[in-house]
Design a protein with these regions (language model features):
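Metallo-beta-lactamase
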Residues: 5, 95-224, 234-236
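Binuclear metal-ion centers of metallo-dependent hydrolases, dominated by the metallo-beta-lactamase
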Residues: 217-252
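Short, structured coil segments at secondary-structure junctions
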Residues: 9, 88-89, 112
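Conserved beta-strand hairpin/beta-sheet module of binuclear metal-dependent hydrolase folds
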Residues: 2-58, 147-151, 155-160
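Active-site environment of divalent metal-dependent phosphoester hydrolases
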Residues: 49, 74-79, 100-103, 124, ...
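Active-site neighborhood of phospho(di)ester-bond hydrolases with catalytic His/Asp-centered motifs
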Residues: 42-44, 65-74, 93-97, 157-161, ...
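Active-site metal-binding motif and surrounding structural segment of the metallo-beta-lactamase
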Residues: 49-94
Length: 252
């Protein structure tokens, strides 16, 4: 399913959901950002998603004109299809420098040579046509080397595994966070590493004019749901905050 998140002038942001959906696999969203005659694919997914995503991208934009493949982190549902994207395009893959030497394990020998750009911990600006995407530090939310991608032109924060919702229709855009939290809380309490990290993130992103927060699983957030989510995340105990001796015992 194709969802148009933004379309103004030369700049478009498209979300693909339920590409190659399987009942025994987690639902994922993939993204295409186009600016003029070039574009970037964000979190292209695993092999389950590849065929449907490649065809979906091809209907919107010539894949050989992609200038970047962006990966928020190195989980298989993010980038396990990389071998096929390395064949189908000449674009480099941008990923945390922590994962730079892990990425070749997704591909046949030699396919990634000279095509992996390690994003430093502080982030970087990535040109896409006449625009840019900014890799924002999102480490330990949940991966050790993790980035979100801020598109100032559309006002969209592509948030990776933060703001995820489970068991929902991903094509629904949420503006009222309250009823939606039941689909978010368990995931965030387990997958996010600590409240300290969430507070640091909240302080960073509050300074941005965010129109939408769009995660890699589940529904996009817009309008009042954006500041409400930032406030909620800032106050959430999660990850190591919830762990104690009872969680580290020999099984019975």
């Amino acid at each position: 399913m194709l969802i148009e998140l933004f379309n103004k002038g030369p700049h478009r942001c498209l979300m693909f959901c339920d590409m190659g959906a399987a009942q025994d696999a987690v639902q994922t969203n993939q993204f295409l950002i186009v600016n003029g005659e070039t574009g970037a694919v964000l979190d292209p997914g695993g092999n389950l998603a590849y065929n449907d995503l490649y065809m979906g991208v091809s209907r919107q934009f010539p894949p050989h004109k992609l200038s970047a493949i962006l990966a928020s982190h190195a989980d298989p549902d993010i980038i396990a299809s990389l071998d096929r994207w390395m064949t189908a395009t000449t674009a480099p893959v941008y990923i945390s420098a922590i994962w730079e030497r892990f990425v070749p394990h997704f591909c046949k020998p030699g396919k990634t040579a000279g095509r992996v750009v390690g994003i430093p911990d502080a982030g970087m600006r990535i040109p896409v046509g006449g625009s840019e995407l900014i890799a924002l530090p999102a480490h330990f939310m949940h991966a050790e080397g993790n980035f979100q991608f801020w598109d100032a032109e559309s006002g969209i924060l592509f948030s990776g595994d933060l703001a995820v919702s489970v068991g929902v229709d991903p094509s629904r855009i949420v503006s009222d966070l309250g009823p939606h939290l039941r689909h978010m809380e368990a995931f965030h309490r387990r997958y996010m590493v600590s409240n300290k990290i969430l507070r640091l993130w909240a302080d960073m992103v509050r300074r941005l004019p965010i129109r939408m927060i769009v995660p890699q699983h589940g529904c996009p957030l817009e309008g009042p749901a954006v500041p409400a989510f930032i406030d909620w995340a800032e106050g959430l105990d999660c990850g190591v905050d919830l762990m104690g001796p009872q969680n580290y015992r020999m099984p019975a």
